[in-house]
Amino acid sequence: MVKFKQTEEIEKIMTNLEQVRNIGTLAHVDHGKTTLSDSLLLAAGMISPKVAGKALALDYVEIEQLRQMTVKAANVSLYHERGGKPYVINLVDTPGHVDFTGHVTRSLRVMDGAIVVVDAVEGIMTQTETVVRQALEEMVRPLLYINKIDRLIRELRLSPQEVLQRLLNIIKDFNMLIDIHASPSVKNEWKVDPNKGQVAFGAALHKWGFTLPIMQKKGFKFSNIVETYERGGEAIEELARELPLYEAILNMVVDHIPNPKVAQKYRIPKIWKGDLDSEVGRSMLECDPNGPTVLCVSKTIVDPHAGLVATGRVFSGVIYEGETVYLLGAKENGKILQVSLYMGPYREIISRVSAGNIAAVLGLEHARAGETIVDISLKGAMVPFERLRYISEPVVTIAIEPIHSKDLPRLIDTLRKMAIEDPTLRIKINEETGEYLISGMGQLHLEIALWDLNQRTGGLEVKTTPPIVMYRETIRVASKMFEGKSPNKHNRVMFIVEPLNEETLKLLAEGKVFEDQEWRERARILREYADWDADEARGIWAIDEHFNILVDTSKGIQYLKDIKDHIINGFRWCVDEGPLAKEPCRGIKVKLVDAVVHEDPAHRGPAQIIPATKDAIFAGILSARPTLLEPILKIEVKIPQEQIAGVMKALNTRRGKIVSIEQTGYLNIVRGEIPVAETLDLATDMRSLTSGKAFWATEFLKWSPVPENMLHEIIARIRERKGLPPNIPRVVFNPDGSVAIKS
């Protein structure tokens, strides 16, 4: 039996890596991850048996309890005994809703294995596929837990034979995901086999579960479970005593998830691109507590009393109170003021945490998710971890302002803290209107951000606009060369703009090409995989967050290096707010072709170079058949046969497109695409058109050109909302051939 253990005992076991497991729970929304976590906390004695299954203890943010869904990733260290041996299981509970995949991305970095929770009725859903794919990209081993088996018996009234067939289908679908997305080196080994105890079955709400080895050992048959539900009441409670869920899950974790020492050998080459033969490389591969300190931050929160708390995994060395470290991203030294373990919402202070474990540290005010923190001796010699790639990007925005202007400083301060904790939430001030813009992954993301704001400020009164869809500006053809002249007429810059090819956009989206990458490596990748010219690939000056690239293709220009930063600033200014509607640009290559620079520094400052750059780049964009891109979602609907017409109607009336319809047993799966702009009240429609019988989910798919017949109307609407003149700016040629942009 599992007993409650104090922090000191957990601390003792943590140094023996054979007895440590770092795992997370992953799933589609509402498939039962947090309810499963409650059963695991019950095992550790952290919540009472009465409330397990209903407590949602890891959903300790109040809104998570209200909505019954997890919005942030929570951490907890559990104690478990297996075969008379004690183990520490560091558990991360992650959100399943598509709007919160950012939290999942960050959590995966610290895990070695994941329990993927799948609802027995709904099966593998879109989000399940996304999180399994993300896990496999980070070399995190997935195991399967099929939850809510009681629904097959009670709601669908399936016979034991039909239940078995349903479970086998889910296992087959799960293994297919591993076949498609896993690295060839682990593909066969990581497919799950129920006979080996790599799949658990159960009902988290009723706290029972089993693996086939447990079933055989205890002499249970599946028909016994069907009979138990027929009897109901006390019999179900007895089942939870006979087959406790935590035992099935934690035994499966201990037996089939590798310990950190084993896992880091194959995970480090995947998530860290430094020299594996260096001292720090070898130390991380070996998960060596005697090596130099390396901590990768997966999550930051701003504690109202303690300040910024950074949680992450120690990949090498030991992290301890008073240690001086270096933050690679923030490029600064820091001092660790306190080290602790997470026990759900509580932090238990301990003196040190060694390699292979998850720690929370205080004192590093500028640490952010994805930060690499290292021993001070590695300053200047350490390569950071692969950057965290977020599957989606913000596509919906709202404007917010305080009702009372005296509250503005408090609003700004709170929004700043929220953006630190959730890097996928973008906060921006609109200088012209004084509004603050909050952009998120979807409506739910924004609703929860507003609720969070309200809680943190004690009910600060604010005005918000309805959700607005975000667009991107792009071009369809290459422009000719345009010349911009500085206001003092002493400097000239010449640019061409052209669309980036699909291969380049793919490399940018996959994080294989980025701004602060070693330039030779980046040039090689662009030449080999995106057909770039060698000189252009070497001449990249800047890459912005929306995938626009500035390239210097000029030759032998005097004083060019003195104005390089001003040109980069002008480029960023242009692509941050394009000429059509001041929306961010996407997929544009801007080439500096030539320049004439004044010899006197006083005549070539930013006030001269930036306007010239802006005029020439905007002229290029406006002449290259500019258009808007809108965000498109992938939608998957699981529905009984008789309700398919309702789904088709809901999609067809909203510019949606049906990609495929597939029959799986008694449910049909409709897969399609739909613009975000058409989904703002889709839930209501979907409920009424399908009599509430549709299980559906969406996920960001791509940016796609707005239909030509809607383009001008959308541009006009955005310009009006932003208080811009109704007409798009135009290019005016000066007598000397240079250009100016006129409103």
Regions found by a protein language model. Give the residues of each.
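P-loop NTPase switch module centered on the Walker A-proximal segment
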Residues: 1-110, 114-117, 156-159, 165, ...
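P-loop NTPase catalytic nucleotide-binding module
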Residues: 1-29, 127-298, 303
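Short hydrophobic beta-strand that contains or immediately precedes a catalytic carboxylate
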Residues: 91-92, 200-201, 438-439
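Conserved beta-strand segments of the P-loop GTPase G domain that flank and frequently precede/overlap
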Residues: 92, 116-119, 145-147, 399, ...
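A conserved hydrophobic secondary-structure block that centers on an alpha-helix together
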Residues: 94, 115, 120-123, 426-428
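Accessory interaction regions appended to the cores of large information-processing enzymes
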Residues: 160, 164, 173-178, 185-189, ...
